[in-house]
Amino acid sequence: MSSEPTSSIESDNLRRSKRKKFKLDFVAAAHGNNQKKSRKDPHGQGDDDDDTFDDDLNHFEPLSVLTEQDVSMEMFEDDEEDTVSRRRTRRSTAHFQDYQEPDRWIENSGPHACHKCPSRYESKSSLANHTKMHLGEKRKFACELCDFSASTLKSLTHHNNIHQNFGVLSQQTSPVIPVASSADSTLNSSINSTGCQINAPPAPKLDEEAPIAVESVVVHHEDVAEFDTTPPPILEREDDGPPVLIREAPVRKSNRPMKPTQKAQKMTKQRERKSKTVESPKGSLPSSSASSVTPPPVRKDVEKPKIFVKTTKKNLKKTMKITKVRQRCPHCPFTTSTVTRLNRHSGGHKLKEGYICPSENCNFMCRKAGFLQKHYILHKGTLPWPPEYVKKGGAKMKRTFPESEEKKIEVTEKVQKMKKMHKRRANTVQVVAKAQLKSYIKVEVDDVIFKKCNIGECEFLTQTLTQLIVHKVKTHDTKTAFPQHRFLCLTCGHRAKSYAALRTHKLIEHTSTHKRFHRTYYLKECVGDKFFVKYNLSKVQEEVKEEPKEADGDESGDESFDSMCPASDVHPETLAAIEMKDVFFCCNMCPYKAPTMNRCQRHYDKHFKNDEFKCQYCSWSSRSKEVIVNHEKLHPTVVVANTNEAPVVKNEIEAKVEVLSKTVSSPVECTEESSLSKSIQLWCQREKLRHPELDEQFTRKMIDGVKGFQCTDCPYTSKYRGDMRSHKKRHDIEQLYRCVQCTYTTNRPVSLKDHLKQHAIVNMSIADIKSRRVVVNQGVKIGMRRGVGKDKIYCCDKCPYVTLALGCLWRHHRNHRDTAKINICSNCSYSSIDQRKMEEHTIIHLGLGLNEAVPFVKRVDQKGRPVSSLTDLNSEKMNERKSTKRKMLDKVEKMEVGEDEEDDEESVDKGTDDGDYKQRPEKKRKQSSEEPASDPELFGSSSQPTRQLSERATRNRINYSLLSKNGSGKPTPSTSSANLEKLAGSSGGASSESPEPDESVEVSHWKIRTFLRSEYGVKESLKCPDCPYKSSEPDVLEKHRYYHMTKTTPRPYACSDCTFNTYTPTALLQHLKLHSEGVYFDPMVKKHMKHRKGDSIPPGVKGYYCKNCSFKTSIHRNFIEHSAYHRQQLINRINITLKRQPPRIEYQRPKLKHQFVAKNAKYCKKCTFKCVSQSNFIEHLDRHGWNQLYKCYSCDYSDNTKSVVDFHQLNHHIVKDQTLHSICQSAKFRLENGVIQIPEFQTEKSKPTPDEFVSKTRGLLKCPSCEYFCHVSSELAFHMSVHHLTEPNARETISYLHMGLVPPKATVTTV
């Protein structure tokens, strides 16, 4: 390869060492040591297959140099394989292929070429790594033909091989092997003999049908001779400039061959130009290292081939756009390429008003001046600014369409006339609009005020507003001023758009009835005297007080002086009349008065101080001059006026009322104020003077010799101001239960009951004071009126309802109907549909009623007939009704049997055998043999009665709705009236005389409720349209439907059958149970379901498609079974997630100091039971009045299970309104059950004292004659001996309490 022989020994040794290294590398490659090199390295070797090599090295033959034909044929074979597989094999990318290639062979094919050297790569990442070798600092091994440098000799050797095979410059495409011929073969052999090798890599394969155009280079023998004789020039890196790059022919981006399905296309000149490739010039490089470089041989210059530019679609589009014919406007120089733009532009030539183009031959107009400026650019001139705006009759328009001068003059005259007419109409409209219908000018003629028309110079005068409005409508045509409001009220001038609106206005404004005084009286009763007086006197006080009262800064600390000192502009008599507070304490040295002793003492001390400012009438002094001025106003007039006044209080009040009447009538005349409002104000002023405590929250009262407080709205009293303030808050807030006599509200019915009892004591004291019958509504008597003045009350004549307002009594009495509605009170005829009203009514019976039975609410049907419930089964009326009905049925049955069997009269007369009843087919109820009554003598004496336990006894252990037998193995007795009488021990009467067969039909709460719902028209349950969920309440169904919608972000747990989605897995499990009802899923079918893809659905047949997989079928049953498979999978996944969740910390309810009570809690009227659930509340109420085996000591609660009754006694009777006897009974019960331990100093037989009973049952002893209460019985005995010794049976009760015994028939209660 080199022209100069190497003479140095070092070069020979270096070549020998390189040969040894190549041999070692060759042996290592044969053993597969370099298989794990990175494929992304553009210079690295690919992985070699181990199967192509043998383990024995002796079989390897020395490498043989191949000819160009062999290499070219081998490369063409590789290319054919690439086109078929479209993926390069490891062998094609390896440097050593079958170990028959030359040591300088390198593959250099790919769509990505380097612009500084002939290297080509398959990927952009490989090219990027290669370009980094051309950039940056110079490394240890650098190339002399380009700026390539590497840190290893192997990379440089690989780069030099590329230069040697493909030349110095960057190749544009993969070179194509020329067609072999005889001349070429001799040429190749001669070239190889000289040491120059011309190797060409394979060309990319094109379509098989398309012809391949190859540009071959023909070399003559003369050129070869010259090529051999001339020595190659020495290439120096410093002298050579940058190589001239030949333009690369376009290569397809995907580097894929053409599709085989493409049809063969004819060869054209343009395609021939595209298919031709240019062979890049080749150079030569030394085969050794960079230190021993020899220049490449000189080659003859080859003519540069012609370069043809590829025409793409974009270039074709550009040329097409240029050659298109542009559309031109006939009126102006505007041109465009589309018809739509031309039509849009021509619309500007057709406008009738706007900014017109100043050009003579152009009539283009636009509505904005900015667009006209863009248009005028086409005329190539300066646009005069501002442009001219032309309307329909403008001169500019006429210039474009020339007409005669006469027509122009006519048009201008018409336009001017029209303008004048419009101006006149606008002026008249403005004048009429300014002069409103109700406005006028006051004119006084002979001391009579007239109303003059204010439109123009009209001289119309009238005294009424209606005549003025009619005048304006007829004379001045005021309707035209407001064409949208054509309808006009001639009375007040109101305008309306429609006749209906005018009609409603007249009905509302001009047909009002006369205000009656009794309506105001009812309003006063409803809102109360306090609010009524303040509301009606607020206007009068504003008129009297011209200037607001300023707060006086008293530095001396006299807080009471600001409230007592009058304003400077108010008359002293008016001030005395407006005063509302009674004065209790007076100063001895001046006329100052104070409501408290402390304020009066502070004022009195200032008489003996020497401050800066002193009073001129007394020795009182102060540090503020304003305070002294206000103090001096108390001296002159008030003292003199008090000396001449009469001692009678009545005359004083009447004098003040006269003064106030003058102040009411003194202000400016008010035409709209009626005499009724004046009379109401005078009445309110009298009430305010008679009852000055209306403005106070509470008043003082002596309680047990101690100063206390009493509420001004109700009889509540307290010794402490804090308790009174908390009580007053109950009058201001709105809560669940409300008092009927005041504004007291509470959430607890027990508190309302205690509050009503305080009213009952006051009502009893005024029961006999002027009681009169109240008659309203055509002679209907609704109640009684008792008391006088402020203490007047109205009482219902059918129940203990009491109110302060007559209207409230009238509304209450309407609920005492002849035919009840759904709910009715057990103690009176009060009925209502609302359950809340019934609860409040029962509290009235408990609080205001005297010696009444405990009320409860009954249910009635639509006709007013009572509906039987479990609480009514023990009543005598129910027993009588059942027994009479049973007798009638028995008589009818006997008569039917007598007609059928006249011969067997004896069997009919007996009536005890059950065989006769079983033979009757029309009798549908079940009959059973009568059980013999249990005899206590047979089984020995026992403390408890022996009888059958009902299903209630085992309701906590087993679901009693499924019970058919109780624990004893015998059938459960029915809850008919006959069996209840037997269980209660009632013998005799009509029921004992007639023998009755026992019925084994079970009756429980859920059966009774379902029967009542079916009988009395309860609403049917509503079904969800998306899933099987049902509910009878629409609100609940609406909440369920909310989880079928996904308005927000989707929830994590969704159903597989419908659109239901929720936040918790447990809620989804509950929902999936609805879909699983009635669907049987066999777990053994899982495998078949999993691999089943579905059935083929013929056209026109309804199909069912699964939304979770590709299953489809036309059979609905198969679809249900398939969806059950998905549902079961979802259930299994949810169960697994629930099991894998970490255990939650058990919730520990915080210990509360006070018992928490829900706002919607329901309270029992007979005990202290309360709950939120309606079903639990009904179940508890049913046990009250149920005559069962075990009974409560304090109420009528009973049950067949002893533990249930024990729990009731321990928790539902926390000493509320019980007698001392019931307290002792409950305490005894607690002692027996171990809740209360017996004291150590007592034996088991001795009973605890009442003090221990009361203290351990958490109760307070209350005196029966007053409000006193205590904890110990000895204190109560002492209290009764001091205050109530004269009461009947008081001595006997006191003696029992002193001895620590329970008094017989005690009336002592607990709080």
From Swiss-Prot:
Up-regulation conditions: Up-regulated by oxidative stress.
Region called Disordered, residue ranges: 1-58, 75-95, 226-304, 544-563, 865-1002
Disruption phenotype: RNAi-mediated knockdown results in reduced survival upon paraquat treatment to induce oxidative stress.
Tissue: Expressed in neurons.
One cellular component term from this protein's GO annotations in UniProt: nucleus
Subcellular compartments: Nucleus
GO biological process assignments: regulation of transcription by RNA polymerase II
Keyword field: DNA-binding, Metal-binding, Nucleus, Repeat, Repressor, Transcription, Transcription regulation, Zinc, Zinc-finger
InterPro entries per UniProt: Zinc_finger/UBP_domain (IPR050688), Znf_C2H2_sf (IPR036236), Znf_C2H2_type (IPR013087)
Gene Ontology molecular function terms on file: DNA binding; DNA-binding transcription factor activity, RNA polymerase II-specific; zinc ion binding
Ranges annotated as biased composition (Basic and acidic residues): 874-897, 908-920
Compositional bias annotation for Polar residues: 1-11, 956-979
Entries under PROSITE patterns matching the protein: ZINC_FINGER_C2H2_1 (PS00028), ZINC_FINGER_C2H2_2 (PS50157)
Compositionally biased region (Low complexity): 280-293
ZnF segments: C2H2-type: 112-134, 141-163, 327-349, 355-379, 451-476, 487-510, 585-607, 613-635, 709-731, 737-759, 794-816, 823-845, 1022-1044, 1053-1075, 1104-1126, 1162-1184, 1190-1212, 1261-1284
Note: Loss of function results in a suppression of sel-12 phenotypes, possibly by up-regulating hop-1 expression.
Official protein name in the record: Suppressor of presenilin protein 4
Gene name per UniProt: spr-4
